[in-house]
Amino acid sequence: MSAPTGQPAYVLHSRAYRENSALVDFLTPQGRLRAVLRSAKGKAGSLARPFVPLEVEFRGRGELKNVGRMESAGVATWMTGEALFSGMYLNELLIRLLPAEDPHPAVFEHYAATLLALALGRPLEPLLRSFEWRLLDDLGYGFAMDADINGEPLAIDGMYRLQVDAGLERVYLLQPGLFQGAELLAMSEADWSVPGALSAAKRLMRQALAVHLGGRPLVSRELFRKP
């Protein structure tokens, strides 16, 4: 049997576990992994924090792994203010939505790229909307953004509502929570210069995420509301 090899990872969340250990949720190309980190107050424990690129060797076949080795694999992504809150939001989304040990290498790569963009001070809203959409799509919850549930191209002057896990349905009577065709088409092209496109994208992603998050609110969203 070959010895375990290290793999790239980021810490999503860590909490104290028993005496000197920590229970850590990692994001890896092989999915979300939970592992026990021994001697969490030592050198390894100082690395077990979010936004630090790591190389981690996991041991064990069960759902709860053990960290055999953990090393830094690069410079930590330094963020403050709303960029930091945004990173925490990404972590919470992944913990809540990503199944354990379900490989999603594209999610891992997009997460790392999004952290870098946040640290560089790129506009937050487009980054968050892109991450939300690509996460939903990679998990199989995506839907067409340029056609309705009947396969018809979206009309610029049309009004649509989201049928979760089905797609966009055209409606002809005004009602709360509708989206304009022009906004949706702008979203499909990531053209945020169209008036109202970013705010509509935020509403759309909230609706799309809500059913998969269940009834529990995201704690990290409250950080944006605090003065």
Swiss-Prot record:
Family under the similarity heading: Belongs to the RecO family.
Name of the encoding gene: recO
The alphabetized list of GO BP terms reads:
DNA recombination; double-strand break repair
Q: Which GO terms describe its cellular component?
A: bacterial nucleoid
DNA damage as UniProt keyword:
yes
Q: Which domain of life is it from?
A: Bacteria
Cite the PANTHER family for this sequence. Answer: DNA REPAIR PROTEIN RECO
Q: What is this protein called?
A: DNA repair protein RecO
Q: Give UniProt keywords alphabetically.
A: DNA damage, DNA recombination, DNA repair
Origin species, per record, is Pseudomonas savastanoi pv. phaseolicola (strain 1448A / Race 6) (Pseudomonas syringae pv. phaseolicola (strain 1448A / Race 6))
> According to its UniProt record, what is one Pfam family this protein matches?
RecO_C
The function of this protein is: Involved in DNA repair and RecF pathway recombination.
Key word Protein biosynthesis present in the record?
A: no
